[in-house]
Regions:
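Alpha-helix boundary/interfacial micro-motifs
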Residues: 34, 40, 46, 67, ...
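Short, internal active-site loops enriched in acidic
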Residues: 61-62, 153-157
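Active-site metal-coordination/substrate-binding segment of hydrolases
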Residues: 75-155
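N-terminal helical capping/dimerization or prosegment-like subdomains
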Residues: 1-92
């Protein structure tokens, strides 16, 4: 599986950067359109990797995205949870690059390079990583029952 992921590294980086460009700021209603765009991005990704059931659930707050792949109904369920929203990037003057224009930089802490963008670490990067790991498991017919739930972290739902 590691070799497969390494072979698709550039493709995966491009996809992650695409997701990170979406300013899905949950605390500001003027970004509600971006929250919906991010939810649809996750929905599309789950469908593309082969989930059997993918749905966007509308809530009084922001949408919840759910996807599952069931291969063996008798196996335990694994639930992967994450959120696709981000906090406002203020104060902007503390950013060395625009928060929704991801860049890969080498630093003393990350000599191999790291992505700098709002949401790269909390939590779009992790959601993306789980979707891609799930994709590899589906390709190898490995998941017994796996469910992915993503939501806006601040919907209070």
């Amino acid at each position: 599986m590691k070799n497969q992921i390494l072979n698709q590294k550039i493709e995966y980086l491009d996809q992650l950067i695409e997701l990170l460009k979406i300013p899905s700021i949950s605390a500001d209603p003027k970004y509600d359109h971006a929250i919906k765009k991010a939810a649809h991005w996750i929905d599309k990704s789950l469908n593309e990797i082969g989930c059997d059931h993918v749905k966007i659930y509308q809530t009084p707050g922001h949408p919840v995205v759910y996807g599952e792949k069931i291969i063996n109904k008798n196996a335990p369920t694994v639930l992967v949870y994450g959120h696709y929203d981000v906090q406002p990037p203020d104060p902007l003057e503390l950013w060395t690059s625009p928060p929704f224009e991801p860049v890969i930089k080498k630093t003393n802490i990350h000599p191999e390079g790291a992505i700098f963008a709002r949401g790269a670490c909390d939590d779009k990067g992790q959601v993306f990583m789980h979707v891609k790991a799930f994709e590899q498991l589906i390709k190898k017919n490995k998941p017994k029952i796996t469910k992915i739930l993503t939501k806006n972290n601040h919907t209070n739902q």
